[in-house]
UniProtKB/Swiss-Prot annotation:
Catalytic activity: tRNA(Asp) + L-aspartate + ATP = L-aspartyl-tRNA(Asp) + AMP + diphosphate
Enzyme class: ligase
Official protein name in the record: Aspartate--tRNA ligase
Molecular function GO labels: aspartate-tRNA ligase activity; ATP binding; nucleic acid binding
Gene name linked to the record: aspS
PANTHER family recorded: ASPARTATE--TRNA LIGASE, MITOCHONDRIAL (PTHR22594:SF5), ASPARTYL/LYSYL-TRNA SYNTHETASE (PTHR22594)
Amino acid sequence: MRSHYCGDVNRSHVGEEVTLVGWVNRSRDLGGVVFLDLRDREGVIQVVYDPDLPEVFDVASTLRSEFCVQVKGLVRARPDSQINDQMRTGEIEVLGKALTILNSAPALPINMDKNQHNTEEQRLKYRYLDLRRPEMAERIIFRSKVTSAVRRFLDGNGFLDIETPILTKATPEGARDYLVPSRTYKGQFFALPQSPQLFKQLLMMSGFDRYYQIVKCFRDEDLRADRQPEFTQIDIETSFMTSAQVMDKTEEMVRGLFKELLNVDLGEFPKMTFAEAMRRYGSDKPDLRNPLELVDVADLVKDVDFKVFQEPANDSEGRVAVLCVPGGASLSRKQLDEYGKYVNIYGAKGLAWMKVNELENGLEGIQSPVLKFLSEEVVKGILERTGAANGDLILFGADKANIVAEAMGALRLKVGEDFDLLQGDWKPLWVVDFPMFERTSDGGLHAMHHPFTAPSGITPAELEADPTAAISDAYDMVLNGCELGGGSVRIYDAEMQSAVFRILGINDEEAQEKFGFLLEALKYGTPPHAGLAFGLDRMVMLMTGASSIRDVMAFPKTTTAACPLTNAPGFANPVQLEELGVSVVEAKKEQE
């Protein structure tokens, strides 16, 4: 039905007859000539119909937006005065000779020109229309190019594309599982996989030493802009490779993606330890485009007569840190109060500040509500350590170290955006040397990555003796403040795996029930292995500049995990529930 895609026709086709199909992007009658913008997935081209062919002209005059049509005509160059540099096909147009309406369209329920006139609910309900818009089509096509390039790279490096089960067993991976009731085993449930973690480890034990899969994963968790109940991972696992080798290979892949698809040279990725990232940026996924850093001043304020500073400065679990904001002294009290409210969201009780007006005038050149509690020596020490200059603003965080990191890390990002401080387009890095475990709110321990991550250079006995001191052989790839992917060397010794389970409060009986197959498999010559998983949706979101992963997925869910297009989820047929042995305790349909 077509000879070319609309967006592929160019000056080299002048004088040729072409057959095009697509949708009417826009139609206008200007002085007895109909100009038709025809759109398909590759772009838009202008088609011209004049009255010399009255039957065709009359049909063209009836066209409206989103009619599906076939066009036949002659490619000709536009006059210089009519060249449109904003269109890929702007140097040419098609003189229409024939026109067939393949399907009509009623008045549209969404605006096809600018999505700011549509709510997200509207866009998702009429997703098949939304995806026709060029910016959306470009993102979906770009996503396809990413997966194609990933497959070429991994195939070329000896990786095997192997599928793993979707119906599997629930394992504790940090989020709630989506459960699927079994009809043949009443009262028992499959779980949709949060990741293929255990199966890809089993593949290493099976001798397939280089595996990959572009795979759907499922997590029943609270959603935000970069989370979905179902998402896609680029999942990679290798045997007989160290963490450094895995990092080198996957970095090579990502650098190749950016060069091939964006013509961007990322350069070699720097490495930073978890401890350094938290100390300098308050985050284990720092955005290095932002030049602001947290500066510790606890030693300077530990003796001041101000409990807000003094107590955390003398607490082994506390921290006092500051941000120095260039030019920030111009902020009003109201603006500073807004920043105070912002850090409240992250658990901070308040935000002390200090304006540097005239350094040369000592304390008289400093403005701060807490200045009366600080000696000239303390103020001088803070100014010297931060490198503050006239016109700068110093913001204080003082609390438990984790609260200071979270609140001041978030404030750092907000201030960086507000003051337009971001430098450069792309700043990747590796974050390494994560703690094996972190404390939970009830005082227990939780695996910082997952329970199958190997510790670095430690025996099972040493790990159990002091688990909070253990460092994992794990690594995260971070780009512009987003975690692109994370991975680790895996535990390949049954004794070490059992030790980790015990530390996490999983006794031997529970471990056998949930992970007996893994512990058994570990006994049979399991090779050293390591891997990494990339979030494909997030990667494409960053590479395309989209504001949400929903804009790079064909059919995403809303932030309430619903699909307005299909009205999923829905109520099950009572007969089906009876067959499954499932009864609904309570179901309340939300009122529209």
